């Protein structure tokens, strides 16, 4: 009591304390970063290695495997996957959440160094690594276009000047430049001319390499001067290479231009990028795992004018895609929802108390509690994101509850004629323990969330802490500022003030009287109510089992990502045409604002597209509806598929898949994997629960298989190394020399001119110079035949792997899809040598599914322990927790009604309901126990009186919580997919709970009281407990 009096009788100190809390909150708010969601990115590092011309199988066995064995020893690696394609290998390392990305990078570099001696000697460069997840959608895409400069020149500007500068910006993890390659001098050989001159491809390669060297020449020096020696030992352009003498034939010089076409071109001609309908170079910017997306984007935008000034005016630098506008719009929507919730909650207080003065008190208490929370958020390193702001929105109903309970009880004493300061002190003393019980038991709900590990735990931690801090500050405010304001501001109601809103007052009195009559009947028919309570428990179990489930609500971020998968034998020219066709279909859609895409590189039959949709206010369809509409149009394109998916703020795993969810097949028997993967993929493609089923296993690429006759080769004086070198020189885009420039290094690339490689007859024109100097055609010692070969070889860990990706059709949930896949695998009878498991987001969903029930039980157990400690009773906590089944039924039924799957957001709603609905029971039980102790009432009389006396605050707190959550249900615009499931769950649970717990709680109270008396050896002490 002295604690309350300290603040009630010292108003200046109390006001200044509240002002201090508010000012700290304002400062914290101004310094908080902005993000779509809490920081939940796994630390991911990508290792890249190249060996131009090497087959996928060669890359897997000679490059990927040695690196994997070394990288697999690094501590904290949770998943390691690799993909080897023509001439390149990429290994993705995903680390545990608590692994520092910089420390992991040092370990990765050490592992690469340790494996260096096991790698092929012909690799043009050492393996490199990047601290970025290639499967993440870029946070920003810049494009370079020009009517004057070539694609190679644009790529040079992008990779030499722009990308390094952008990479240095805080938060940027990787800048991937696509759409072309660096400038190069290309030597296109004429096989017939070479044969006529008696010049081998190795002769050409050696001559070019020897003619373009960069070696130190030293200096001349005398007693007084020093002269640096400089020679014309380097060739820079195609014009300088053209007259190069490579051979003498019968005394005549054979120049490079006589046997080849030499051009200034690009290093790899099999690359193409586009923005809308125009060729473009793309700079795809990804952030570091720990970076804030908004801060990173703002930093990049601030540097754009400087970047534009470093490139010629004829080059147009544009932002093709930016993830930040929809994030900002989503957060603005949440902020508006928060403001509406505060206004509605204050309106509820005004309607019940019918006093402007009384309404001012919670109108002050609520902002102080919410604003003060920002200071704690800043100190904890949190951000302003959808979840933390939703926590504050929901907290509106909670923080006003404490003020309402105190205010309503003080107002009741004032109506009885007590003086304001005395009423404030007496009223606060009576409900102080109640408010403490309500707040502590509510915070206890979130303790299991704070201890939860993995991605769900990291995702929900900010929500739980933010809400807990708001409740803690609210508890302090309701026991200090609220009673002080009541004591100094409230007065006895005047008659004319009592008439104000008399219609609502009469309705409330009528409701209370009706409730009293119905409660008397219920207390005389307790068995029926008990049966209803048991029925709700059973209904909870059935609804939870049957309701569709997913990991996280499908977001509409305004950005789509598409993966193109074409026939495995398609040429680059045909693939570029497919890219243009797909881009035209998408560009013509009325909901699309911008589209960029690229194809080429080591995977000729694949490509990527990034689509920016118009803002939500300018389109009527959701991202998923747009995908459904485009899917029908895209299906008409023969020879290729474009798989679209909406970019999400949460994406788990490092696989660059063509769909949102993955199912991975593993086997130590590669033949078994290649046999069963097509069967499983075809079966899954028939399931109605899955859409866009595709696989990264591509085993049917066209291959020309050459078979050497080793006996003939030995007789003719030819070895296998010379024959393989011939093929690499002719068809491998072999980099044979380096051109050094001040800003970069460029390559001289040699191959047979594409005009002479249009069909299989190109092999017949190839020849080798043997050890006697004779030209021996390839057909003399080799035969060839067409065959199939893999376009890529994939590993997970050290096992062969194949990943099947899929999206969800409209109306289907991830639980539907996972159950269907499990059934399909059982029906197919897949052998034990082939193991299947979900990967990425689908894997996290499976893990979360297994822990959801345990989490809910843990929350209930924690609340029980806290209540048991507060009440010093085993029984009364059970009475209070009996309110939960009805809330669960209401929440699950509401989700079913709105066709919303049970997700992580809905789980948060269930956890909140555990804390919310027990408040009603706490108020009833507290007053009933008080009446039994001091009023000498029977248990039935005590609980009946408690229900009637607490009817008004119960209605107020419930409606405050309901109206605080209602804007979440009704909100639209950006980010509503996250807000609505939370609002639906809470509103549904509150409505059902309010209808039932007003009757079930008194019945359960009496039941346990009788049970306690029956088993108690000291009934009298039990009554006065």
From Swiss-Prot:
Its main location: membrane. It comes from the Bacteria. The keyword Hydrolase does not apply. Pfam families: ACR_tran. Induction: The mdtABC operon is transcriptionally activated by BaeR. One of its GO terms (cellular component) is plasma membrane. It is a multi-pass membrane protein. GO terms for molecular function: xenobiotic transmembrane transporter activity. InterPro entries: AcrB_DN_DC_subdom, Acrflvin-R, Multidrug-R_MdtC. It is found in: Cell inner membrane. The chain crosses the membrane at residues 3-23, 333-353, 360-380, 387-407, 431-451, 463-483, 528-548, 853-873, 875-895, 897-917, 953-973, 984-1004. Keywords: Cell inner membrane, Cell membrane, Membrane, Transmembrane, Transmembrane helix, Transport. The keyword Cell membrane applies. Belongs to the resistance-nodulation-cell division (RND) (TC 2.A.6) family. MdtC subfamily. The MdtABC tripartite complex confers resistance against novobiocin and deoxycholate. NCBIfam families: PRK10614.1 (NF007905), RND_permease_2 (NF033617). Part of a tripartite efflux system composed of MdtA, MdtB and MdtC. MdtC forms a heteromultimer with MdtB. PANTHER family: MULTIDRUG RESISTANCE PROTEIN MDTC (PTHR32063:SF34), PTHR32063. This is Multidrug resistance protein MdtC. It comes from Escherichia coli O6:K15:H31 (strain 536 / UPEC). The gene is mdtC.
